[in-house]
Curated annotation (Swiss-Prot):
The chain crosses the membrane at residues 6-26, 38-58, 65-85, 92-112. It is a multi-pass membrane protein. It is found in: Cell membrane. Keywords: Cell membrane, Membrane, Transmembrane, Transmembrane helix. Belongs to the UPF0344 family. This is UPF0344 protein BCA_1194. It comes from the Bacteria. InterPro entries: UPF0344. It comes from Bacillus cereus (strain 03BB102). The keyword 4Fe-4S does not apply.
Length: 121
C-alpha cells in the first residue's frame, strides 16, 4: 500500500506541474486537471488506508504524528487545487503557493521521519 501511495503522490505532483505549465502558457489544461483530481481521490484513499493500518500498531505518540501528516497531506492537495483554480481564473497565487510549499515540506519531513517512511533522519 505504501508503494501505491507514493506512486499516486508522484503522479499527482507530475500532473500538477503539467497542468500548471499548461495554464501558465495560456492553454487549456482542463483534461490534465481532471486527471489530477482523480489522483487526489487515489491519494486520499490510499493515505487513509495507511493511516487506519498504522493505528492498529502505533504506540505512544505515533497516532498524533500520523494524524498531523494526514492533515498536512490534505493541505497539500488543497493547495494544489487552489493554485490551479486561481491560475485558470488568472488571479494571484502567491499566498496559495506559500501554503502549498509549507505543507509539502511538512509532509515530506514527516514522511521521512516516521517509521513507515524512509529512514533519512
Amino acid at each position: 500500500m505504501v508503494h501505491m501511495h507514493i506512486t499516486a503522490w508522484a503522479l499527482g505532483l507530475i500532473l500538477f506541474f503539467v497542468a500548471y505549465s499548461l495554464y501558465s502558457a495560456g492553454r487549456k489544461g482542463k483534461g490534465v486537471h481532471m486527471g489530477l483530481r482523480l489522483m487526489y481521490i487515489i491519494i486520499i484513499v490510499t493515505g487513509f488506508m495507511l493511516y487506519m493500518g498504522i493505528m492498529k500498531t502505533a504506540t505512544s505518540n505515533m497516532h498524533m504524528w500520523y494524524g498531523l501528516k494526514m492533515v498536512a497531506g490534505i493541505l497539500v492537495i488543497g493547495g494544489m487545487e487552489m493554485v490551479l483554480v486561481k491560475m485558470s481564473k488568472n488571479k494571484a497565487t502567491g499566498a496559495v503557493w506559500g501554503l502549498f510549499i509549507v505543507a509539502l515540506v511538512a509532509v515530506f519531513y514527516l514522511g521521512l521521519k516516521l517509521p513507515i517512511g524512509w529512514q533519512v533522519f
